Every structure is written in structure tokens, then in C-alpha cells.
């Protein structure tokens, strides 16, 4: 049952975000960001994602910046954090937590994604908006898939079948 839910969530998120990144206005804007070397566009992207998610027929609910209390036994410096998105697919009983990171460089993007993974593991269990696993979405310049797997494998033990890459152009 556990793997079934992971596979179902992966398929749902992959289809949904593939559709998001195929929108012409998103492609054009991301190409402009690349061309002009603009940084700090993560919030813009998250707002676009939320608008998109809320318009999807297969999404029951989607929220951005879901606040959670940190487990003070694990995290001494901060008492509160936010999960970028929680999304509930139609027919599902619980939300899927999602963290989004952007960086032009793949290595920095992966490092920041791992920090979000660690942050999520420091949230008080009672505060988690879901019993489902956290999913990470990273947006960075294109790199070879072997290099991407090397970056991931240095820090996480993750099945590569749950890593999806899509060039945006």
C-alpha cells in the first residue's frame, strides 16, 4: 500500500507539473529570466503554480505557505516554518506536501532542496499537514542526468525512478 501511494503521488505530480511547465507564458517568462540573468523569482513561480493548481479539475485543494511548528528537540533556532505547497488530489483523503526550489546552478538547487528536506523532518509530527511523503521540485539550468543523479546520491538515498527531469524550452 505504501509504494502504491508513492507511485500514485509521483504520477499525479509529474503529470500536473509537466502540464504547468508546458504553458507558453511560463516557458516565455522562464526564458526571459534565463536571458536576463534574473534571480529571486521563486515567489513569482509559486504564485503561478498555485493559480494553475487551483484551476485543475483533478485538484481538490491547494494551499501555499502552510505554517507548521518545528520540533524544538530537533530545531533550536526556529519555532515556525512554512511548507511551500500542500495539494490534495480529487478523491484523496490527505494532502501532498511540496517544496519548490530554484537556482540557475543545479548543484546549489539540489543543496537547497536537501535543506528543505531536512527542515521538513524537523517539523513536529502533530503539525504535519499530511502523513504523505514530502516531494521536492527543483528548477535549474539543464544538466546531464548522470550529473544530476551524482548530486542527489551524494546527499540522499533515493530511487532514481522518482526523479523526473524535463527541459523547459
Give, region by region, the residue ranges found by the protein language model.
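Non-catalytic C-terminal interaction segments of nucleic acid-processing enzymes
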Residues: 2, 153-169
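Conserved catalytic cores of phosphodiester-cleaving nucleases, focusing on short active-site segments
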Residues: 84-106, 120
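Interdomain/boundary linker segments immediately adjacent to catalytic/signaling cores
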Residues: 1-55
Amino acid at each position: 500500500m505504501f509504494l502504491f501511494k508513492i507511485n500514485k503521488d509521483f504520477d499525479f505530480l509529474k503529470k500536473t507539473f509537466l502540464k504547468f511547465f508546458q504553458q507558453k507564458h511560463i516557458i516565455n517568462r522562464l526564458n526571459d529570466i534565463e536571458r536576463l540573468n534574473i534571480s529571486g523569482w521563486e515567489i513569482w513561480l509559486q504564485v503561478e503554480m498555485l493559480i494553475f493548481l487551483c484551476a485543475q479539475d483533478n485538484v481538490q485543494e491547494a494551499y501555499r505557505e502552510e505554517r507548521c511548528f518545528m520540533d524544538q528537540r530537533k530545531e533550536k533556532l526556529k519555532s515556525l516554518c512554512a511548507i511551500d505547497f500542500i495539494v490534495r488530489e480529487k478523491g484523496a483523503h490527505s494532502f501532498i506536501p511540496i517544496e519548490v526550489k530554484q537556482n540557475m546552478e543545479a548543484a546549489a538547487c539540489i543543496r537547497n532542496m536537501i535543506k528543505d528536506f531536512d527542515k521538513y523532518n524537523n517539523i513536529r509530527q502533530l503539525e504535519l499537514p499530511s502523513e504523505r511523503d514530502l516531494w521536492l521540485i527543483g528548477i535549474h539550468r539543464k544538466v546531464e542526468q548522470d550529473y544530476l543523479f551524482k548530486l542527489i546520491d551524494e546527499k540522499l538515498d533515493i530511487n532514481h525512478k522518482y526523479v523526473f527531469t524535463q527541459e523547459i524550452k
